[in-house]
Amino acid sequence: MESFGEQLRALREERKLTVNQLATYSGVSAAGISRIENGKRGVPKPATIKKLAEALKIPYEGLMYKAGYIEEVHEARAPYETKCKLLEKAEAYDLKNLALLENEKWQYLNKEDLLMLDHYFSFISDEAKKRSADD
């Protein structure tokens, strides 16, 4: 079984991030990330894992499992599945810095904003469906 550091490196590389980029996005020092990945430091504390999970745009629970803090990951919750699909789609088109994927931006939205976003998303989705039917 791969160590936590090896798994962290694989996740970072899958997202085509450098150690310095992950450090910038997470607030965890580049040296700290490097030590974790190279096995020179033990498993980080849950607070550090949370920062890394958010920067990697993966569920915190999944990274806690990889770190050995929890024994099983319960079935993925719908919001995580949706976010993962959105992330996969963005990565397929090499769109790395979409505001839509930034957790901190969501905190400012109220109910009306979310309903408007849902309406706009439905419109865009319907238009895309029409375009794909025409192809």
Curated annotation (Swiss-Prot):
Q: Which residues bind DNA?
A: 19-38
> Could you state one GO biological process linked to this protein?
regulation of DNA-templated transcription
TM ranges: none
- Domain HTH cro/C1-type, first and last residues per copy: 8-63
Report the Pfam families cross-referenced here. Answer: HTH_31
Q: Which GO terms describe its molecular function?
A: DNA binding; DNA-binding transcription factor activity
> What InterPro entries does the record point to?
Bact_TransReg_Diox, Cro/C1-type_HTH, Lambda_DNA-bd_dom_sf, RghR
Q: State the function annotated in the UniProt record.
A: Represses the expression of yvaM and both rapG and rapH. Binds directly to the promoter regions of yvaM, rapG and rapH.
- The protein's name in its UniProt record: HTH-type transcriptional repressor RghR
From which organism does this entry originate?
Answer: Bacillus subtilis (strain 168)
Q: Which gene encodes it?
A: rghR
